[in-house]
A protein has these predicted regions:
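Glycine-rich phosphate/pyrophosphate-handling loop used in enzymes and phosphotransfer proteins
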Residues: 1-176
Length: 176
């Protein structure tokens, strides 16, 4: 299976143990960033916006994630991203479709985040572009591979906190 190397029914599937360790994000969640709430706030007027979005409103209207980023999901994501497990992509599609159900239907394009050319040479593929291409086919929304352009290389972000990540990618991209 993905990550564990256990025998599963089909290539790209997760073992029952790995599946059971994943924490999927479901409602209730922040209407803006998708941050999961422990309980429904009942705040109809504010539209269930988290404290982080109230304090520092993001530059986007809506974002969603399929999984809480923890040890279990990190293993799955990094195995795909760095471990050449691109065959796992079909397994991710239902997760991404469910997480993005309210966003994808209203989207004009699915736009991947471009990698710096040196990082593509090391990895041999851009995982974001693969996801965009595959998801585009699944949800019938065109993907636009050159919708963003990378202006400069950035350091890897795995060891950075949220503020450091924001600073790291600031002014790294442009819309052509």
């Amino acid at each position: 299976g993905i990550v564990s190397g256990e025998i599963v029914d089909m290539q790209g599937m997760l073992s029952p143990q790995a599946w059971g360790e994943l924490n999927f994000i479901a409602d209730p969640q922040c209407n803006r960033c998708g941050f999961p709430f422990d309980f429904d706030t009942g705040d109809v007027n504010e539209g269930n916006i988290c404290a982080g979005c109230h304090k520092n409103p993001p530059l986007f209207d809506k974002a969603r994630s399929a999984l809480i980023y923890d040890d279990a999901s990190r293993n799955v994501i990094l195995s795909f991203k760095h471990g050449d497990q691109t065959y796992a992509l079909p397994s991710f599609m239902p997760w991404l479709q469910q997480a993005g159900r309210g966003i994808l239907a209203r989207s004009d394009y699915i736009i991947p985040v471009p990698l710096h050319r040196w990082r593509i040479l090391r990895r041999r593929y851009n995982q974001s572009a693969l996801i965009a291409k595959y998801l585009s086919r699944e949800v019938h929304v065109p993907h636009l591979l050159d919708g963003l352009q990378r202006k400069r290389a950035t350091q890897t972000q795995g060891h950075l906190n949220a503020n450091e990540r924001e600073k790291n990618v600031k002014n790294a991209f442009t819309v052509p």
